[in-house]
Structures are given as C-alpha cells and as structure tokens.
UniProtKB/Swiss-Prot annotation:
The keyword Lipoprotein does not apply. It comes from the Bacteria. This is Nucleoid-associated protein Cthe_2143. Belongs to the YbaB/EbfC family. It holds the Pfam family YbaB_DNA_bd. GO terms for cellular component: bacterial nucleoid; cytosol. The lineage of its organism: Bacteria, Bacillati, Bacillota, Clostridia, Eubacteriales. It is found in: Cytoplasm, Nucleoid. The keyword ATP-binding does not apply.
Length: 113
C-alpha cells in the first residue's frame, strides 16, 4: 500500500477525512439557516397562503375573509391542505438545492432532515 493512503482513495485518506469534516460543518450550518429561510405557497388564486420554513415548520397561514363560507367549510379545508402541501413541497425543493450546493449534486443523503 502506498504511504499515507489506501487504494482507491487517491493516495491520501487525510484529505478525504478533511473534506468529510468540512461537509459535516457545512450541513450543520445549512440546518441552522433553514430554520430561518422560508417559502410561500398559495391555493385558490391566493385565497389561502401558507409560509413554511426549510425545516417544514408552518409559520403562517393567511385566509382571505371572502373564502370563509360557513356553508362550504370543506372547500376551505381543501384550499388549506393544498397550500400547506405546496409549501412543504417547496421547502423540500429548497432543502435539496441547499444540500446540493454542499455535496456538489451527489444526491440526497438520507436522514439529514
């Protein structure tokens, strides 16, 4: 075996370890940043708007008064569900984009978020 390395690791395991440690620090930083970053989604032409963080916490739900109809609560529920699901999908996309900046597009790393 070559000095300072293992076969298949480009000859220097120390560089690989340093890169992994940097990636871990970067991931921790991104996790903290995602607590503050938000995405917004709406349904019903803006009748219901939802704001979620990158950690998938719902921060705000706004409902326009004109869509509140006591005789059609089901429609309002559907609008809220659609807006929340869209906000969570956008949060997932944001997380994926942030992670790919760190991993260089190597794909998702299971269990990070």
């Amino acid at each position: 075996m070559a000095k300072g390395g293992f076969p298949g690791f480009g000859g220097n395991i120390n560089n690989l370890v340093k890169q992994a440690q940097k990636m871990q620090r970067d991931m921790e930083r991104v996790q903290e940043e995602l607590k503050e970053k938000t995405v917004e989604a709406s349904a019903g032409g803006g009748a219901v708007t939802v704001v979620a963080t990158g950690r998938k916490d719902i921060k705000e739900i706004t409902i326009k008064p004109e869509v509140v109809d006591p005789d059609d609560v089901e429609m309002l529920q559907d609008l809220i569900l659609a807006a929340v699901n869209e906000a969570l999908r956008k949060a997932d996309e944001m997380v994926t984009a942030e992670i790919s900046k760190i991993t260089g597009g190597l794909g998702g790393i299971p269990g990070l978020f």
